[in-house]
Amino acid sequence: KNWAVLVAGSNGWPNYRHHA
């Protein structure tokens, strides 16, 4: 789940949900 935190912190929460 480290990648999720990195993406969410880099692009934002919306990006994390889109990736998931």
UniProtKB/Swiss-Prot annotation:
Biological source species: Fasciola hepatica (Liver fluke)
Cysteines engaged in disulfide bonds, as pairs: none
Protein name: Hemoglobinase-like protein 1
Highest rank taxon of the organism: Eukaryota
Keyword Oxidoreductase: no
Reactions catalysed according to its record: Hydrolysis of proteins and small molecule substrates at -Asn-|-Xaa- bonds
Gene3D superfamilies noted in UniProt: 3.40.50.1460
Enzyme Commission no: 3.4.22.34
One GO MF term attached to the UniProt entry: cysteine-type endopeptidase activity
Keyword Protease: yes
Protein keywords: Hydrolase, Protease, Thiol protease
InterPro entries: Peptidase_C13
Similarity comment: family membership: Belongs to the peptidase C13 family.
Protein's GO biological process: proteolysis
